[in-house]
């Protein structure tokens, strides 16, 4: 059975405004997430994320509520229908920020079940790695 969502949560030693910039601005996204990034930061805006080892993937911005909620739809395969929804929620916690990331919609992808399961498993591991990189980037 394909899990429908992944949830990860970390506390970052930086204020929400700094974390917001890191998760929404292309020049920061390349410091922790992808090798190249383009983002039109408005609902309906296009995203283009490139990893040299994995290719280029597109997305669409869904929610921009600075500095609290950023959400985007993410299509990981150019030849496949459907997308997952990534919602990043930032909450002040003293001088730090709690960042919660939920990626959902794996069960609704139109891919074969083994591919959906593998994709969810890879992203579960990937978000752990990427969020650790984000935390390190935020305090540089």
Feature locations, PLM:
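Short amphipathic
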Residues: 4-12
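Short beta-edge strand/loop motif at the mouth of beta-sheet-based domains
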Residues: 7-8, 18, 25-60, 67-69
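Hydrophobic-ligand binding "helix-grip"
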Residues: 38, 54-100, 104-107
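A conserved amphipathic terminal alpha-helix motif
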Residues: 105-140
């Amino acid at each position: 059975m394909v899990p429908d969502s992944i949830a990860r949560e970390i506390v970052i030693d930086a204020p929400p405004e700094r974390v917001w910039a890191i998760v929404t601005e292309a020049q920061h996204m390349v410091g922790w997430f992808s090798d190249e990034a383009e983002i039109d930061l408005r609902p309906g805006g296009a995203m283009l994320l490139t990893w040299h080892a994995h290719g280029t993937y597109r997305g669409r911005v869904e929610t921009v509520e600075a500095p609290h909620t950023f959400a985007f739809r993410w299509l990981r395969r150019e030849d496949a229908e459907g997308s997952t929804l990534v919602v990043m929620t930032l909450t002040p916690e003293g001088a730090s920020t709690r960042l919660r990331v939920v990626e959902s919609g794996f069960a609704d992808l139109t891919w074969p079940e083994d591919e959906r399961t593998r994709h969810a498993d890879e992203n579960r591991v990937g978000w752990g790695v990427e969020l650790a990189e984000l935390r390190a980037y935020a305090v540089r």
